Amino acid sequence: MLTVALPKGELLKNSIRLLQSVGLDFSAFLDSGNRQLQITDASGTAKGLLVRGQDVPVYVEYGQAQIGIIGYDVLREKQPQVAHLVDLQFGYCRMSVAVKASSPYKSPLDLPAHSRVASKYVNSAREFFQGLDLPVEIVPLYGSVELGPITGMSEAIVDIVSTGRTLKENGLVEITTLYESTARLIAHPLSYRLNTGNLHQLVEQLREGALTKV
């Protein structure tokens, strides 16, 4: 039986709609009263796992799920050993550097050397500033990263931005974009190579389904 890892949160609804378009129904995960973390499609051919977004590539890499749907931001940060198959064209957001709107910094290179940068995307932040040859201290934060500059703990943040509303409401402004992110279909490399459970056909159906929704 095929197992699909699905992310809790923003990507879940569109992920389920896409899977429904190819005949796999995990819509029970969207029910407000649902407490199940694992359900089987009515056809009996596939099982869905509902997990934290950060954990989707882990389940796929270790083979507990043959495929999964997750944002490119997570893949870029975690660098898991999975097969990257399809850009699903939904869940758009961007990884950005932001500072206080009242600050003098108009670009990352305006930041003083050894500034503090708060982020839950530690690897992405470090890679970016190393690429600029600008030494900074990355401060790991895993909630309300915007408070870093507000409280003075950091001069900047690196975080995911979708509409920019949260930044604006907290007096922050973007000064550059590291990369853009959308939902991606990933697979366990060996399962995909061996075409376990006719995986290639399903992937092509999902690819076509994603294209028709663009």
Swiss-Prot record:
GO terms for biological process: L-histidine biosynthetic process. It is found in: Cytoplasm. GO terms for molecular function: ATP binding; ATP phosphoribosyltransferase activity. Keywords: Amino-acid biosynthesis, ATP-binding, Cytoplasm, Glycosyltransferase, Histidine biosynthesis, Nucleotide-binding, Transferase. Coiled coil: none annotated. SUPFAM superfamilies: Periplasmic binding protein-like II (SSF53850). InterPro entries: ATP_PRibTrfase_cat (IPR013820), ATP_PRibTrfase_CS (IPR018198), ATP_PRibTrfase_HisG (IPR001348), ATP_PRibTrfase_HisG_short (IPR024893). Pathway: Amino-acid biosynthesis; L-histidine biosynthesis; L-histidine from 5-phospho-alpha-D-ribose 1-diphosphate: step 1/9. Its EC number is 2.4.2.17. It holds the Pfam family HisG. It catalyses: 1-(5-phospho-beta-D-ribosyl)-ATP + diphosphate = 5-phospho-alpha-D-ribose 1-diphosphate + ATP. HAMAP family: HisG_Short. Lacks the C-terminal regulatory region which is replaced by HisZ. Heteromultimer composed of HisG and HisZ subunits. This is ATP phosphoribosyltransferase. It comes from Nostoc sp. (strain PCC 7120 / SAG 25.82 / UTEX 2576). The lineage of its organism: Bacteria, Bacillati, Cyanobacteriota, Cyanophyceae, Nostocales.
